Amino acid sequence: MNIDIVISADHIDEKRLINKTVIIIDILRATSVITTAINNGCKKVIPVLTVEEAKDIAKNSKEDIILGGERNALKIDGFNFSNSPLEYTKKYVEGKTVVLSTTNGTRAINNSFNAKTILISALINSKATAKAIDKLNEELIIINSGTNGQFSIDDFICSGYLIDCLYNIRKDLELSDIAKTAHYIYTNNKDIESFVKKATHYSRLKSLNLEKDLEYCFQKDIIDVVPQYKDGYIIKSNI
């Protein structure tokens, strides 16, 4: 199995994604939010690029809609929830549709529509994602959402952990140089949160007193669900 990594949403070459399996990672915090919401019974998540698009969907939909997301890590005015996974509890999201717009994660998803299969991953569901990847048995591109178009340490080391989970299932992995680097960094820094504490995005969230979000997002494999983007929205994968 060939595995490569794209370091940010801005670095996505859509033509490269054709007939590939793509994994979207934005552990701080979009893919952690999506995974948590789906695990808590959310009917589906609709990832959108703009605030206006999100509000239009909510206005015109007959479904029970929750608006969630952030800009520069802050809750969007008029939205129900921010980009904190701790807000998307079963009490609030079960049976409902979440329309989500974030600075990095939803942009990475929307830039990946050419892929054959799009799965959503974070630290909280990496082992489950690895099992799904193994079943698909296709060429894999791991897309790090990054931070404002730039490389992000947190997404990169999460990619390394996902590769490590895959190695525990199968040994026939052919890694690109950047994928090898991600795996090496993880295997030498398995206490992920300690490693990324000096990262730009981590520092930004900590400055906003979001330590509980950080603590939650850096847990490994607390959820055995893999969200999948298909036909315009994200649902629980049956892979």
UniProtKB/Swiss-Prot annotation:
The keyword Zinc does not apply. Its cofactor is Mg(2+). It is an enzyme of class 3 (hydrolase). It comes from the Bacteria. It catalyses: (2R)-O-phospho-3-sulfolactate + H2O = (2R)-3-sulfolactate + phosphate. Keywords: Hydrolase, Magnesium. GO terms for molecular function: 2-phosphosulfolactate phosphatase activity; magnesium ion binding; sulfopyruvate decarboxylase activity. Gene3D superfamilies: ComB-like (3.90.1560.10). InterPro entries: ComB-like (IPR005238), ComB-like_sf (IPR036702). Its EC number is 3.1.3.71. NCBIfam families: PRK00886.1-1, PRK00886.1-4. Belongs to the ComB family. This is Probable 2-phosphosulfolactate phosphatase. The lineage of its organism: Bacteria, Bacillati, Bacillota, Clostridia, Eubacteriales.
